[in-house]
Structures are given as C-alpha cells and as structure tokens.
Amino acid sequence: MDNENEFTGADILLKALKDQEVDTIFGYPGGAVLPIYDAIFGQNFLKHVLVRQEAGAVHAAEGYARSSGKVGVLLVTSGPGVTNVVTGLTDALMDSIPIVCISGQVPSHLIGTDAFQECDTTGITRPCTKHNYLVKDVSKLSETIHEAFKIASSGRPCLLYTSDAADDLLC
C-alpha cells in the first residue's frame, strides 16, 4: 500500500490503523461504514469485536484502553451510530481515556441536505471530544488518522473523533 491513489479510503484507513499498531477495534456495522467492514474482512492483523449497540463499542474501547495502555478504537456508522456513542465519548473525555472513534458519514455532496442517517457529527461530538475531524478528501485520510492518534495519546490523553464521508471510503 505504498501508493494511496491505488487504494480505497477503507484500505487507506486500515493501513493507517496498522501503522498505529492497532490490533483490536470495537464496532457495529451500518451502511456508511460497510466498505470498511469489507476491508476488515479481507485482512488478518485487526481483530474486530462486534457489539450489540454502538454504546457498547465506546465503553468496550474505554475498557480496552484502560487495561492495555493503548488507544482504544471504535467504528460506528453515521446518524444514529454517532448519536449512540455520545455518552461514552463524554465519559472517556472526563476520565482522560485515549480513544479514537471513527464513524461513517453520508457522501460529501449530501452533507447538509438531511440525507438518510445524516447528522452534524462534528457539531454533536465537539463538546465531548478533545478534537474532531470531518474528512472530505481521501488524500487527507491517512494524515488525519495519524494526527488523531498523536493527539489522543499526547498531553491529557483523551478522545478523538473522525468522520469519513461515504464517498471517501469508496474512492
């Protein structure tokens, strides 16, 4: 995966997670993140823990971070997937637990149109995260993920949130 132009956003995301030595990710599938789940299925370095609901993913990532000393990582879909993790994100922020939450988003041309399962993910998560991103350009995805891990694990450890527009995952 040397040339990012040859890979989908999902491939680039997985390479960035591998670069960060992530071995476990917690999550619940949904339409906006299915390309990531397809990529997870085709690799062998990352263990995915399927939870029953997104809130379980964020709390599992908290427990993983506390017990392992690593950054906890979770993956949720857009809309209700994001809103279901707000309590856990706030808990992680208040307890200084290093977590990176990755969510899907509707295609960038649909942002702001009340598309199916669209919500203002960055606005909703701004008060309960150390920093958040909305990645609309797949060429910035790897850089953003690496920066998220750096911020999550430096200073006061805390939570980072990144939302990937659906078209980035398919590029």
Ranges and model annotations:
Residues 161-171:
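Single conserved hydrophobic/aromatic residue that forms the stacking wall/gate
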